[in-house]
């Protein structure tokens, strides 16, 4: 990842970069499964956005779930600047988070399994950072538009917060909200660790299991 001045606070309105009216070019197809990155997706496929630090490693966590995952992509969300570049996002002056778009079939892969992967794959108590990756674009975020899915996400947060407290961790700082516009990241970011298996991945969880109370089954069950 690139290293810019590390902002630990969201930009003020008069600091927001202007962006551009047209989308940036990105990959047409998923490097791993060959499906169209942007869709349209088949009937019954739902989408959710997850921010859990550097999106290179985060995306791999989700495409590796296998059955039920239609496609994954990385991009920028929960910010203000239209059609931002990666370099602009890294300045902290667009307001965006690095996120993974997950298109999945809930009949095969329950949303709860995505939640479990999300919570267990990063430390959601770190605020505007994940490990050595510091900045507003690395904040923990969960973005869904469906009210029922959002309620499910909030319930999982509350259950996981109890599990974390029991192990001595601080409060969860994850934002859960409507996704707003999602902007696909540049082509070279898509499925980055499939193209570069030895590439950077700073992702690390807390070691605390997502509790059964979230309605999620473990892989051993």
Curated annotation (Swiss-Prot):
NCBIfam families: msrA. Its EC number is 1.8.4.11. The keyword Oxidoreductase applies. It catalyses: L-methionyl-[protein] + [thioredoxin]-disulfide + H2O = L-methionyl-(S)-S-oxide-[protein] + [thioredoxin]-dithiol; [thioredoxin]-disulfide + L-methionine + H2O = L-methionine (S)-S-oxide + [thioredoxin]-dithiol. One of its GO terms (biological process) is protein modification process. This is Peptide methionine sulfoxide reductase MsrA. The keyword Kinase does not apply. The active site is at 54. InterPro entries: Met_Sox_Rdtase_MsrA_dom, Met_Sox_Rdtase_MsrA_sf, MsrA_MetSO_reductase. PANTHER family: MITOCHONDRIAL PEPTIDE METHIONINE SULFOXIDE REDUCTASE.
